[in-house]
A protein has these predicted regions:
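Conserved small/polar residues in nucleotide/adenosyl-binding loops
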Residues: 181-188
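Alpha-helical transmembrane segments of multipass membrane proteins
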Residues: 20, 42, 63-65, 87, ...
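Mid-bilayer segments of alpha-helical transmembrane spans in multi-pass integral membrane proteins
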Residues: 83, 87-91, 106-126, 147-148
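Juxtamembrane/interfacial segments flanking transmembrane helices
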Residues: 31-36, 125-136
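Structural signature of hydrophobic alpha-helical transmembrane segments
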Residues: 46-56, 108-110
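Short amphipathic alpha-helical coupling elements at transmembrane boundaries
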Residues: 38-45, 134-142
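Membrane-interface helix termini and inter-helical loops of multi-pass transporters
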Residues: 31-40, 94-101
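C-terminal ends of transmembrane helices
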Residues: 62-73, 126, 138
Length: 192
């Protein structure tokens, strides 16, 4: 029984860590991320659509596509990761909390990179994902010889270039904890 519950609790905990870093470090300092999270941040900064809601809206069509390609069994942990992340984001969006890092974007990007990297690593090591670009990378990996880690790096790079074009702020894109933590989490999982 404990073996079945432990991965579930672990994925939920990882989602909480990731959502905490995103809500309290990335968003207040207008930093960005790659992948689907980057798209949710674009919509938040431009249109004030809550990150928690946009995370779900982006993932619904991706899950439908992945369901058709991979079948239902392989998606349960990803559904749990995505749903948990959206719930934690919604919870943290309602809890006002500030950390005085005196606007030091280097420290902010390091702290957010560590939190997001740990959160993703915990989720991945428990067999889950946060959906989004992870699903896109898995689908592309199925039909190419490119590793999931390299595909994620390419997707993240593309989103960051889109962010640079839209917001024209190289400084914020540079301070973004680029996909390095994401890439390292996949190396830990053994997908490179």
């Amino acid at each position: 029984m404990l073996r079945k519950i432990q991965p579930i609790i672990t994925i939920i905990l990882g989602a909480a860590i990731y959502a905490f870093g995103l809500t309290y470090f990335v968003v207040p300092h207008h930093l960005f991320e790659g992948g689907a999270t980057g798209v949710t941040l674009i919509t938040y900064y431009l249109f004030k659509i809550p990150v928690s809601l946009m995370n779900l809206l982006i993932n619904i069509p991706l899950f439908i596509l992945a369901w058709k390609i991979f079948g239902p069994k392989t998606l349960y942990s990803s559904l749990l990761g995505t749903f948990s992340l959206s719930v934690w984001l919604a919870v943290f969006e309602r809890i006002p909390l500030q950390f005085d890092l005196q606007g030091d974007l280097i420290i902010v990007s390091l702290v957010s990179g560590v939190l997001l990297g740990i959160g993703l690593g915990v989720i991945f090591n428990a067999g889950g994902t946060t959906g989004g670009s992870d699903i896109v990378a898995r689908i592309l990996n199925k039909y190419t010889n490119i590793s999931i880690g390299k595909l994620l790096f390419g997707i993240d790079f593309f989103i960051l270039m889109l962010i640079l074009i839209l917001f024209q702020d190289l400084r914020l894109v540079t301070y973004t904890p680029v996909s390095y933590t994401h890439l390292r989490a996949h190396e830990t999982r053994g997908n490179l």
